[in-house]
């Protein structure tokens, strides 16, 4: 199967889109092709950013799908001193916990490259109160980017996954986190367990957002997300539409064949 591109323009936006935007969807033959395309696109965005500025900022997703991408990135000959890594969400567990997104990225990628420790910006999960931890990371982002409220930091690249229920980061269906509009970081919840997560407005300030999704189980949610009449509160990934940036959806054939 050759890659297929679909363009969703301002003439056929989801209900949540209020500004003209083009969304690019590419369906790859299998998971290996998906990771290869993801790697090529991430490297392109890093290179382009470094051609225009002194450093690049990347926010990572968790889950199993991006792990091969992170492993592939670990062998790339990049100037890691110019790359700053953040996380788009994190389970509220210790950094060495098997479920930690930070741990997964470190083992697959960051511990295997000569990146300065100061360039790694994990979400804090050591405070007894997740709300205080969310505020700490919010403060860190604003201080590091030099941005005061009500403005939001602008990431060069945000990587996102999508769950079978249409959630992304830790923005779950029918939850209060979806409506937070004045903060960079909020507390999401899954099965009663707190998580830290980027907010919708922070994600939508990014210069580039790349969704990576695989598997037949994603099809029903993708149908609703790409529908002109889907419910964004039930399928939170619909809320992601960078106001002045690029949005890519990279899918394997199992997930995206019905969109070809």
Where in this protein do the model-derived segments appear?
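N-terminal glycine-/serine-/threonine-rich phosphate-binding loop
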Residues: 5, 13, 17-58, 131
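Glycine-rich N-terminal segment of FAD-binding domains in flavoprotein oxidoreductases
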Residues: 50-75
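Glycine-rich beta-strand-to-loop/alpha-helix junction loops that act as flexible
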Residues: 60-65, 160-164, 214
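A glycine- and small-aliphatic-rich helix-loop capping segment at beta-alpha/alpha-beta transitions
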Residues: 72-80, 103, 173-181, 228
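Ligand-binding beta-strand-loop-alpha-helix segment within the catalytic cores
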Residues: 81-156
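A short secondary-structure junction signal
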Residues: 132-134, 169-174, 221-225
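Class I SAM-dependent methyltransferase SAM-binding "motif I" and its flanking Rossmann-like core
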Residues: 157-201
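ATP/nucleoside-binding phosphotransfer catalytic cores, i.e., glycine-rich phosphate-binding loops
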Residues: 207-260
């Amino acid at each position: 199967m050759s890659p297929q591109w679909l363009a969703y323009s301002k003439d056929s936006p989801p209900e949540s889109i209020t500004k003209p935007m083009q969304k690019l969807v590419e369906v790859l033959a299998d998971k290996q092709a998906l990771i290869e395309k993801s790697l090529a696109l991430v490297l392109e965005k890093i290179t382009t950013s470094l051609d225009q500025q002194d450093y690049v900022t990347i926010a990572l997703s968790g889950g199993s799908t991006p792990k091969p991408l992170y492993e592939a990135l670990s062998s790339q000959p990049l100037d890691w001193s110019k790359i700053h890594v953040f996380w788009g969400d994190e389970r509220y567990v210790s950094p060495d916990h098997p479920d930690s997104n930070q741990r997964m990225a470190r083992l697959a990628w960051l511990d295997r490259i000569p990146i300065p420790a100061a360039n790694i910006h994990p979400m804090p999960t050591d405070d007894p109160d997740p709300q205080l931890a969310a505020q700490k990371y919010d403060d860190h982002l604003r201080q590091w980017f030099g941005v005061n409220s009500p403005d939001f930091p602008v990431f060069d690249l945000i990587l996102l996954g999508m769950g079978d229920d249409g959630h992304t980061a830790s923005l779950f269906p029918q939850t209060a986190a979806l409506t937070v509009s004045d903060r960079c970081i909020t507390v999401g919840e899954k099965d009663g367990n707190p998580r830290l997560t980027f907010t919708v407005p922070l994600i939508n300030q990014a210069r580039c957002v790349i969704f990576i999704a695989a598997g037949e189980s994603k099809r029903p949610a993708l149908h609703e997300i790409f529908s002109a009449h889907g419910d964004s509160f039930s399928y939170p990934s619909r809320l992601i539409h960078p106001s002045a940036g690029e949005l890519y959806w990279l899918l394997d054939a199992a997930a995206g064949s019905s969109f070809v």
